[in-house]
C-alpha cells in the first residue's frame, strides 16, 4: 500500500478538470498525476512543466527523450513510470523490443544501438546515475547547441 495514496474518483470540484487536462482525451489519469493532485497548486505548476517536457518544443527529439526517460526509470527502478513511458511513447519513438530490453537491463554496447547518439545518451544517463557526473563525449552532444539546451 502506498504511503501517500492517489486520489480516487469522485474528485473534488476542479480536480477532475485538472487531471483530464493532463491526459490525452479519453485516457484516465495515471496514478502519478492522481497522487500529485493531492496538492493542486503543485499539480498546476507541474502541468506546465510537463507540457513542455513532453512537447515538440523540448530541445531533445521524442526518441532522445524516451531513451533518456526509459533508461533513467529503469536504472532507478521506477517501474510504474517506466511502464507508462514504454506503453505511451516507445512505438512513437521507434524503439524496438530489443532496445526496450536493453534500456531495461542492458547497456550502450548492446548491438541494438547502431547510432552513436543513442549510445551517448545511455552512457550519459548511466554516468549520472553511477557517479553524478557526465562524460566529456556525452557533454559533446550539446556542442551544436550554443544555449546548452540539450545538456540541460
Predicted regions mapped to residue ranges:
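Mobile cap/lid helix-loop segments that border enzyme active or cofactor-binding sites
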Residues: 1-62, 111, 120
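Short acidic alpha-helix initiation/capping motifs at coil-to-helix transition points
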Residues: 23, 42-48, 77-83, 128-137
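Short amphipathic alpha-helical segments and their helix-coil junctions
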Residues: 44-58, 102-108, 135-144
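Conserved alpha-helical segments that form or flank metal/cofactor-binding pockets of metalloenzymes
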Residues: 60, 65-99
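Histidine/lysine/aspartate-rich catalytic loop segments that bind and position anionic ligands
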Residues: 90-115
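Acidic/histidine-rich alpha-helical segments that form the ligand environment
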Residues: 113-152
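Short alpha-helical scaffolding segments that buttress acidic/His motifs in well-ordered protein cores
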Residues: 36, 46-50, 67-73, 103-107, ...
Amino acid at each position: 500500500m502506498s504511503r501517500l495514496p492517489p486520489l480516487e474518483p469522485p474528485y473534488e470540484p476542479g480536480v477532475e478538470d485538472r487531471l483530464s487536462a493532463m491526459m490525452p482525451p479519453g485516457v484516465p489519469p495515471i496514478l502519478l498525476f492522481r497522487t500529485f493532485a493531492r496538492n493542486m497548486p503543485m499539480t498546476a505548476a507541474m502541468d506546465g512543466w510537463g507540457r513542455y517536457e513532453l512537447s515538440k518544443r523540448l530541445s531533445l527529439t521524442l526518441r532522445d527523450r524516451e531513451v533518456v526517460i526509459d533508461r533513467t526509470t529503469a536504472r532507478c527502478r521506477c517501474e510504474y513510470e517506466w511502464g507508462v513511458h514504454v506503453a505511451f511513447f516507445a512505438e512513437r519513438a521507434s524503439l524496438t523490443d530489443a532496445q526496450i530490453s536493453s534500456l531495461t537491463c542492458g547497456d550502450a554496447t548492446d548491438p541494438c544501438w547502431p547510432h552513436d547518439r543513442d549510445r551517448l545518451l545511455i552512457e550519459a544517463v548511466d554516468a549520472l546515475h553511477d557517479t553524478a557526473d557526465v562524460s566529456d563525449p556525452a557533454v559533446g552532444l550539446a556542442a551544436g547547441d550554443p544555449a546548452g539546451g540539450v545538456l540541460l
